[in-house]
Amino acid sequence: MSHNHDHNHDHEVITLVDEQGNETLFEILLTIDGREEFGKNYVLLVPAGAEEDADGEIEIQAYSFTENEDGTEGDLQPIPEDSDAEWDMIEEVFNSFIDEN
């Protein structure tokens, strides 16, 4: 999934830690409420400070998440590649987001 729009606005940031303990800072591009259809929410992330490639695009990562009861943190999970219904919904919402921005 790629993303191409004006970055002259602030994004919330999140730090992801990989299996080796390396921390990477990401900007939260978009959150999606998918609880009604899939029982979870989704977040689209871009690496903090990422520059557009030659085609004017930036790589986007998508995760599902469940917030803790206090709404402050939660667990991010990769979205299964074979979950076509989830990916279709994410793509539809993302495309609407891009069209509006």
UniProtKB/Swiss-Prot annotation:
Q: Which InterPro entries match?
A: UPF0473
Show the taxonomic lineage: Bacteria, Bacillati, Bacillota, Bacilli, Lactobacillales
What's a Pfam family this protein contains?
DUF1292
Q: What is this protein called?
A: UPF0473 protein stu1961
PANTHER family referenced in this protein's UniProt entry, alphabetically: UPF0473 PROTEIN CBO2561/CLC_2432 (PTHR40066), UPF0473 PROTEIN CBO2561_CLC_2432 (PTHR40066:SF1)
**Record-stated family:** Belongs to the UPF0473 family.
Q: Which organism is it from?
A: Streptococcus thermophilus (strain ATCC BAA-250 / LMG 18311)
